[in-house]
A protein has these predicted regions:
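Glycine- and acidic/polar-rich repeat regions and solenoidal domains
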Residues: 1-199
Length: 200
């Protein structure tokens, strides 16, 4: 059990971090499973993954003002987690940076966050990025996830004058999105030509 953690107001207040920016391409092989994170709201990254080949599964994040952030590193897996926001401000889901991840069978309900706090945020990248910055989202598979009454699913998150590389070779398939209050199922901040949308 992890909780409660009030808003800290700056970086360095993750509830859990695996690795550092300098270890991004080292395999940690850490498994985070069967935990309850309740109102863990220290900063935007509740669980911050900064290494490769980790698994985050079967956890519940309850009213956490932040996300599971695949911040640095490749080939991480996020599956069978439950995110419940109950409409609480800045409650989020999963933020995606880097390559080779699999994100599947997660259930996300009532998440009110936007942009970096989105229920799903797939980020734009910095061209020729150092491992410690924002590397391109490539070869990422997102499938069989269920989103219910979430404020924001966003592709191209963080696009600005520096982050200009859209995701490539990404698939978003067999997902369920239910939200009667939205006119569109997701927001595309940048070009989504590199993302395959199928059977959603």
């Amino acid at each position: 059990y992890f909780g409660e953690r009030p808003v800290y107001g700056s970086n360095g207040a993750e509830t859990m971090r695996v690795g550092t920016s300098q270890q991004a391409y080292s395999s940690s092989n850490t498994v985070i499973e069967n935990n309850l994170f309740e109102r863990c709201s220290g900063e935007v990254e509740v669980i911050s993954i900064k290494s490769s080949d980790n698994i985050i599964r079967n956890n519940t994040l309850l009213e956490c003002e932040g996300v599971v952030a695949l911040r640095h590193g490749d080939r991480n897996t996020v599956n069978d987690n439950l995110f419940i926001g109950n409409g609480r401000r800045n409650t989020g889901g999963i933020r995606v940076v880097n390559a080779g991840h699999q994100i599947y069978d997660n259930t996300l309900v009532g998440l009110a966050g936007t942009r970096f706090f989105s229920a799903l945020g797939v980020m734009d990248a910095v061209p020729n990025s150092l491992p410690t910055r924002y590397c391109q989202v490539v070869d990422v598979k997102m499938y069989r996830n269920t989103f219910v009454d979430c404020t924001n699913i966003e592709f191209g998150t963080g696009k600005d004058m520096e982050r200009t590389l859209a995701p490539e070779k990404v698939s978003f398939t067999d997902n369920i999105i239910i939200n009667k209050g939205l006119d569109q199922p997701y927001i595309a901040v940048d070009d989504v030509a590199g993302i395959q949308f199928k059977d959603n």
